[in-house]
């Protein structure tokens, strides 16, 4: 299921990268960013006898892009002219913000930069599909698409804020009216949305791959540590159990101080049982220095003397029985 979701995300990322680059390339290559009215299309149709055109007369309809303006009406219908962002009859202050906006608008640096970044991001997406084990390629693609979207939106804001969307020679009272944005402008805005979506998807794919790689590495490490030959050694097991049973050993230590008064031994004890008893008590001496107690050793010595006395008495009784028994 995870692989299916990742494959779908990768497919959407590839399709989105192609769509974002195509939309931006079409937007900067076409001349339909703005529809406006301009006098440039009918300015030469007037003679000296007719006089200048009326001040309130609207110009002919034009459509313009980032670099050209084309006439839809007038005697220059179907002709396109290069946009002059700095007319000679206007005196501009070179330190003003309007002049800087006109420079940025004339250069169109942000839309061009966005297109270049989209192209590089698309190449990284393609390389990421070929070299699927290298996650850094997908991360680089996501960063490039996010940067391309930011550059695109900055270019759109500059285009609107510069108030030069109408590149005609309109008068100051007509610049605020009679224009609307065309489909090339909306293609550029849609390219921004698609580019940011692709960038988020690419970063998400990188994060999921990185998480899966970490989980796989951790699982292999645990598997290798469990199959290590050191884990099968008795001393290694003893050290692992010793840390877990430290609290239990402290609770069980008082039971070793049992008094030999309560022990009742009937009859003689064979030598085999005596050796088993003595051997079974030997491991109890293997304790840490923290569990050492003088009372415990004294009790053990009393127990040992008690066993020897009973052994002698039992052996003496058995010899008497043998002597008094009739043959």
UniProtKB/Swiss-Prot annotation:
Keyword Ion transport part of the UniProt annotation: yes
Transmembrane segments: 10-30, 108-128, 137-157, 187-207
One GO biological process term: positive regulation of synaptic transmission, glutamatergic
Topological domains, Extracellular: 31-107, 158-186
Record-level GO cellular component terms: AMPA glutamate receptor complex; cell body; cell surface; glutamatergic synapse; L-type voltage-gated calcium channel complex; postsynaptic density membrane; somatodendritic compartment
Major subcellular site: membrane
UniProt KW keywords: Calcium, Calcium channel, Calcium transport, Cell membrane, Glycoprotein, Ion channel, Ion transport, Membrane, Phosphoprotein, Transmembrane, Transmembrane helix, Transport, Voltage-gated channel
Expression sites by tissue: Detected in heart left ventricle.
Annotated compartments: Cell membrane
MF (Gene Ontology): calcium channel regulator activity; channel regulator activity; ionotropic glutamate receptor binding; voltage-gated calcium channel activity
Listed Low complexity bias regions: 226-236, 246-256
One Pfam family it belongs to: PMP22_Claudin
Record topological domains on the Cytoplasmic side: 1-9, 129-136, 208-327
Glycosylation site positions: 42, 45
Phosphoserine: residues bearing it: 259
Stated family: Belongs to the PMP-22/EMP/MP20 family. CACNG subfamily.
Record's subunit section: Interacts with CACNA1C. Identified in a complex with the L-type calcium channel subunits CACNA1C, CACNA2D1 and either CACNB1 or CACNB2. Acts as an auxiliary subunit for AMPA-selective glutamate receptors (AMPARs). Interacts with GRIA1.
Function: Regulates the activity of L-type calcium channels that contain CACNA1C as pore-forming subunit. Regulates the trafficking and gating properties of AMPA-selective glutamate receptors (AMPARs), including GRIA1 and GRIA4. Promotes their targeting to the cell membrane and synapses and modulates their gating properties by slowing their rates of activation, deactivation and desensitization and by mediating their resensitization.
Protein name: Voltage-dependent calcium channel gamma-4 subunit
Lineage: Eukaryota, Metazoa, Chordata, Craniata, Vertebrata
């Amino acid at each position: 299921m995870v692989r299916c979701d990742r494959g779908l995300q990768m497919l959407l990322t590839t399709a989105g990268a192609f769509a974002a680059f195509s939309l931006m390339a079409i937007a900067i290559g076409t001349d339909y960013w703005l529809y406006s009215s301009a006098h440039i299309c009918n300015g030469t149709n007037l003679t000296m006898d007719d006089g200048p055109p009326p001040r309130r007369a609207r110009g002919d309809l034009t459509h313009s892009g980032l670099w050209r303006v084309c006439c839809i009406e007038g005697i220059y219908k179907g002709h396109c002219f290069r946009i002059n962002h700095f007319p000679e009859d206007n005196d501009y202050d070179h330190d003003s913000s309007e002049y800087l906006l006109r420079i940025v608008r004339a250069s169109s640096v942000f839309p061009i930069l966005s297109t270049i970044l989209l192209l590089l991001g698309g190449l990284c997406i393609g390389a990421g599909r070929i070299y699927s084990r290298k996650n850094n390629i997908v991360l680089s693609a996501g960063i490039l698409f996010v940067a391309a979207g930011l550059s695109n939106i900055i270019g759109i804001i500059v285009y609107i804020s510069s108030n030069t969307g109408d590149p005609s020679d309109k008068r100051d009272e007509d610049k605020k009216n009679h224009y609307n944005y065309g489909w090339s402008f909306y293609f550029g805005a849609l390219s921004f949305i698609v580019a940011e979506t692709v960038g988020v998807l690419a970063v998400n794919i990188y994060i999921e791959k990185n998480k899966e790689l970490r989980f796989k590495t951790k699982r292999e490490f645990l598997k290798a540590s469990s199959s290590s030959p050191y884990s099968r050694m008795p001393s290694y097991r003893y050290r692992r159990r010793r840390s877990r049973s430290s609290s239990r050993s402290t609770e069980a230590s008082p039971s070793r101080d049992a008094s030999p008064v309560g022990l009742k031994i009937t009859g003689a004890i064979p030598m085999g049982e005596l050796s088993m008893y003595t051997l079974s008590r030997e491991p109890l001496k293997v304790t840490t220095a923290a569990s050492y107690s003088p009372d415990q050793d004294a009790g053990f010595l009393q127990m040992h003397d008690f066993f020897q006395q009973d052994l002698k008495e039992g052996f003496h009784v058995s010899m008497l029985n043998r002597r008094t028994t009739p043959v």
